Amino acid sequence: MDVFMKGLSKAKEGVVAAAEKTKQGVAEAAGKTKEGVLYVGSKTKEGVVHGVTTVAEKTKEQVTNVGGAVVTGVTAVAQKTVEGAGNIAAATGFVRKDHLGKSEEGAPQEGILEDMPVDPDNEAYEMPSEEGYQDYEPEA
């Protein structure tokens, strides 16, 4: 604990010196702050390396233990999202509720939403009449 206090004290001295002086104070503060950080780093290097290695190993173990549960959770969320999208499509009139079939696994059937018209501005599209079109024949 004394190591940390001594290092922080040196850093604090640097900050105080910077506040009292201008350009010279800033340079001195930088030097003392660096000195304090290096002091703490040199005294705790071995402990930090061991601690980081231990934390990394424990994290790896926990990720392995939780990994299966996360995959299951993501699958459930995706399923509920697809079901919700189908309900919204039916409620807005894009598809009829009787077209929202379910497969044997309970998942919506593929291709249900593929034929839905895309309308980003929420305006109805009308096809132009064929009278305004001319036949085009490319030149050879």
Swiss-Prot record:
Q: Where is the composition biased (Acidic residues)?
A: 112-140
Q: How is it modified after translation?
A: Phosphorylated, predominantly on serine residues. Phosphorylated on Tyr-125 upon osmotic stress. Ubiquitinated. The predominant conjugate is the diubiquitinated form.
In residue numbers, the region (Interaction with SERF1A) covers: 111-140
In-chain residues carrying the UniProt-annotated modification N-acetylmethionine: 1
The record lists Cu cation as bound by 2, 50
Keywords, comma-separated and alphabetical: Acetylation, Cell projection, Copper, Cytoplasm, Membrane, Metal-binding, Nucleus, Phosphoprotein, Repeat, Secreted, Synapse, Ubl conjugation
Among the record's GO biological process terms, what is one? synaptic vesicle endocytosis
GO MF annotations for this entry? copper ion binding; cuprous ion binding; identical protein binding
Residue list for modification Phosphotyrosine: 125
Q: Which GO terms describe its cellular component?
A: axon terminus; cytosol; extracellular space; membrane; neuronal cell body; nucleus
State the superkingdom.
Answer: Eukaryota
Which residues are recorded as modified (Phosphoserine)? 129
Q: Where is this region: Disordered?
A: 99-140
For this protein, the parts annotated as crossing the membrane are none
Compartments where located = Cytoplasm, Cytosol; Membrane; Nucleus; Synapse
Where does this chain mainly localize? cytoplasm
Keyword Secreted assigned:
yes
In terms of InterPro entries, this protein maps to:
Synuclein (IPR001058), Synuclein_alpha (IPR002460)
Physiological role:
Neuronal protein that plays several roles in synaptic activity such as regulation of synaptic vesicle trafficking and subsequent neurotransmitter release. Participates as a monomer in synaptic vesicle exocytosis by enhancing vesicle priming, fusion and dilation of exocytotic fusion pores. Mechanistically, acts by increasing local Ca(2+) release from microdomains which is essential for the enhancement of ATP-induced exocytosis.
State how it assembles.
Answer: Soluble monomer. Homotetramer. A dynamic intracellular population of tetramers and monomers coexists normally and the tetramer plays an essential role in maintaining homeostasis. Interacts with UCHL1. Interacts with phospholipase D and histones. Interacts (via N-terminus) with synphilin-1/SNCAIP; this interaction promotes formation of SNCA inclusions in the cytoplasm. Interacts with CALM1. Interacts with STXBP1; this interaction controls SNCA self-replicating aggregation. Interacts with SNARE components VAMP2 and SNAP25; these interactions allows SNARE complex assembly and integrity.
Protein name in UniProt: Alpha-synuclein
Q: Which organism is it from?
A: Saguinus labiatus
